[in-house]
Amino acid sequence: MKIRIEQTSVEENEVILRCAQLDDEMLRVLSLLRSGMQKLLVWNEHREMLPLSVSKVVYCETVEEKTFVYTHDGIYQTALSLAELEDRWGDLGLFRAGKSSVVNLHEIQKLKNCGSGRIEALLTTGEKMVISRHYAPILRERLGL
């Protein structure tokens, strides 16, 4: 597959896929493009509803049946469950880290084995998150470790 990027002075970004046939690889590319355009609806501490780009998510956690979304800019709440977040945006890097947390793989700076099969992840915010022993092998496989 060839990839060509052209920078122009158009007002709106445009992606054109040229293919001999729409095979599984091209369908996956198309799916990634579409999911990347979707916004996660969150609300802030003032109860204002905001669209949030998934790429801004550092991690998410569930506390007392409420799902919180952590970014570099603040903490938000969403009506989606962790399973829904992972299902919708797993291809964009949202990965289940434990029973009550999802981490954006693109926001991990360093990984460290911490015994009992768990992995400690240092995030770009300086926070540490533990990947449970249940999800650690899946993470290793996904990252090719």
Language model features with spans:
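Conserved binding/recognition cores within well-folded domains
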Residues: 27-124, 128-130
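N-terminal regulatory/sensing modules of transcriptional regulators
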Residues: 1-27
